[in-house]
Amino acid sequence: MIGIAIRPGRYSYALIERRGEFVVNIPTKDLLNQTEYCGVISGRDVDKFSKSGLTPQPSSKVAPPLIRECPVNLECKVRKKIRLGSHDLFIGEVVSLHVEEDLLDSRGDVDFSKTCAMTYMHVGYWEIGNRLK
């Protein structure tokens, strides 16, 4: 399971509400500019793929596309929505996981120290990958 919080006025919110599914694409730090562009420009009026240079790739179990340049993609179906004030939290069941082979450890788990993956949290972008325990 995974959770994503989105404001109800966002275009992506309407798409998730209508389809009941979404994809989480985990970008790497070399995609910072494209990621920031996609985060601030609405797809309501602009084709983000053509403008950002990112490549849509068909998903295997849901309608929304994967982003080919992202090394980790999670295809999800909405199982619950929780209202949290300014945002709603969509809880999604991961129905398919795509990971670049060279990012897997000997057990087949994602080794995030190899990904240079990043995330956005309130005031900026942060690199993921240092195991604490």
Language model: regions and residue ranges:
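Basic, polyanion-binding surface patches
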Residues: 1-133
